[in-house]
Amino acid sequence: ISHARGKQFLYDEGTHIPLVIKGPGAPKGKKRNDLIEHIDIAALSLAAAGIQIPQKMEGQDILSSKHQPKKFIFAARDRCGEAADQIRSVRSKDFLYIKNFFPERPHLMPSNYKDSKLIIKRLRDLHAEKKTNTLTNKLLFSPIRPREELYLYNHDQWQTKNLAENKKYEKTLTELRKNLAHWIVQTGDPGPETLDVYILETEDQMSSTGNKVSRENYRKNSELYKKWFKDGK
């Protein structure tokens, strides 16, 4: 869960995974700053095992002499448990662009999984006691989120200064927005599930939740999300 903006979100805190490679064919003592994605690990593993990479695979063998570093990498988040969301992002060497498809929903939406964690409980308690600072209130407890977020890595390591409305970066924002839109079409991104599918999935998950308190929290949360679906929120 990290500090509430990590797991299940598309900031670096939730997506950046250090990669260390050791073995035959791996150069020793070399550091690289390439942009790579999880899907590249499958291609890399096949190549390391001497298996031909299928042409239909999007992943790349990053140790190949023919490897061309990517200009952009992409990430996505949808429903996690009963917490229905739709977030997409694209990252370049210098910038991170995030699009929230449900900006009317709060950042820390109700989640039986997350709300059971001590860090989230403590943060919610501190906020209720008015002991959280302005930045925390803005990033975690705002009732709505920006539709678009843009962050400059070298000057904003933790992605707290949204530049999406800064005219200075309008060209960058437009470029990344177009690249994300192209990726969504190219990959056939289906978007969020329908309300009917949400109901079927969450009812199945709720029935397998053993703890009575957790099951009741899950039920209350899913009822709220169903209302949001119907309200177009």
Q: Each predicted region: which residue ranges?
A:
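Acidic catalytic loop of the alpha/beta-hydrolase fold
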Residues: 1, 104-105, 159
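Histidine-centered active-site microenvironments of extracellular/periplasmic hydrolases
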Residues: 1-30, 34-37, 56-58, 76, ...
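Non-catalytic, well-ordered alpha-helical segments in soluble enzyme domains
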Residues: 24-25, 33-68, 155, 168
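Long, internal low-complexity/basic segments
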Residues: 16, 131-148, 155-233
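C-terminal cap/loop subdomain of S1 sulfatases and analogous C-terminal strand-loop tails that border
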Residues: 49-149, 221
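Aromatic-acidic/polar surface patches that form glycan- and anion
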Residues: 31-38, 88, 140-143, 169
